[in-house]
Amino acid sequence: MMKAVVDIETDALNATKIHCIVAQHYQTGETRQWIKDECVQFGGWSGKIDQFIMHNGLSFDGPILNRLANAKIQPGQIRDTLIESQLYNPVRDGGHSLESWGERLEYTKGELTEFEEYSEDMLQYCVRDTELTRKLATNLEQEGKGFNPQAYELERNIRIIIDRQQANGFAFNLMEGQILLAKLEDEQHQLESQATEMFEPTEVQLKTKVKYIPFNIASRKQIAERLMERGWEPKRYTDKGNIIINEDVLSQIKDMPEAKMFNRYFLLQKRTGLLKSWIQECQEDGRVHGKVLTLRTITGRMAHHKPNMAQVPAVYSPYGKECRSLWTVSNPETHKLVGTDASGLELRCLAHYLNDTDFTNEILTGDVHSANQVAAGLRTRDQAKTFIYAFLYGAGPAKIGKIVGGSAQTGRKLIEKFLSNMPQLKKLRSNIQEAVEKKGTIKGLDGRRLQIRSEH
């Protein structure tokens, strides 16, 4: 198999031209270069290559070479060292950039600041990147031993789909979004004025005068101080000893209308923050092209930014329906927006590993959450649903206890009762803990190794 390490330099991330291309034979290190107008000749040469080794090649180099250098590189031909780096250890100190890898491998990248025009320095910079990518690929081959190749194939295919999703974007009703933002900001301003009238400014005695600091409804510190002045006794603190003020804490203060006002303000803060991020990222095509990092967490879950389109409020939450209605289709006459959801994915995977006939039947034909309600001794089905997902994702006794309005001791008893009624789950949990103690990793669903940083 003919393998080549390839790197390119372009005029911009959204490239209109390729300044230079450097390719290095993976086994022998033999190097070829194309500069300026020669770059279109790369396409003919690339037809001889079976595998292209590139850093971010799926999302950047490969598509640009196909578009501007007459290449016909297929995604299956690309070995992307960026995806490998993220897959083998999603949370590396320093990240996954080629620059970071240069420091780890003691083969630092070159420095270049001007990319608009070709230069000899640019070519040498590209050569250096190609050599570094070759060293990185060799290093990752060793690191990836024991990983199921299907894990890489899965992440490669996901990256291809996500790149298409980002390019297409999601239609956004900009006008309605601006109207909703104005409405919520208006209520915010009203609450700010109301709070200023309700709470006197704080007096600060200076050397020669008294300074008056107006009450700031957005300051959690000031909120805590004013509530305590009215007799509230805080019960929750941060590790540094600061009083915790959030929507959960405020919702539990039933005898002070001020707490309800503060809670409302925090809600509006969150909603206006989301709306501003959506509006800011809406492009001229009327669509939001949100970014997705496909391998951002230790478990391989995705992360979203610019904006975070995975955090649109649920339809049943305050202003959830209004927020969700902003995400639409470009032409309602020809297209419809269809929502889908997978049913109980985590519990179906759990059933596979438990191999418990009764549990499997509850998922397929019964009501697994009602069954879990009985097993854990919970009051409601909703509590059981919240409990099982929190438990599966590592919630400890304190978090579990909070679900039912109790303490860490309550949570500990709930877990013990649930496991006593689910012996197969107790056994599975014990086996996983033993495996982690021995290896420090566990095997993922697709054969990848998941590094465990803490017991939960």
Q: What would you call each of these model-derived segments?
A:
Residues 21, 58-71, 86-88, 224-231, ...:
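Short active-site loop/helix that positions an aromatic residue
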Residues 366-379, 448-456:
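Generic long, charged, amphipathic alpha-helical segments
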Residues 16-22, 339, 346-376:
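Metal-dependent catalytic core segments for phosphate chemistry
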Residues 1-9, 13-14, 22, 29, ...:
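Conserved "right-hand" nucleotidyltransferase catalytic core of DNA-directed polymerases
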Residues 383-393:
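Short, amphipathic alpha-helical "recognition" segments used to contact nucleic acids or chromatin
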Residues 72-75, 189, 232-238, 354-366:
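Cytochrome P450 catalytic domain signature, combining two hallmark sequence patches
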Residues 14-19, 23-44, 50-144, 152-162, ...:
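Active-site-proximal helix-loop-helix substrate-binding element of RNase H-like nuclease domains
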Residues 3-5, 51-52, 76, 337:
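Hydrophobic "anchor" residues on beta-strands that sit immediately upstream
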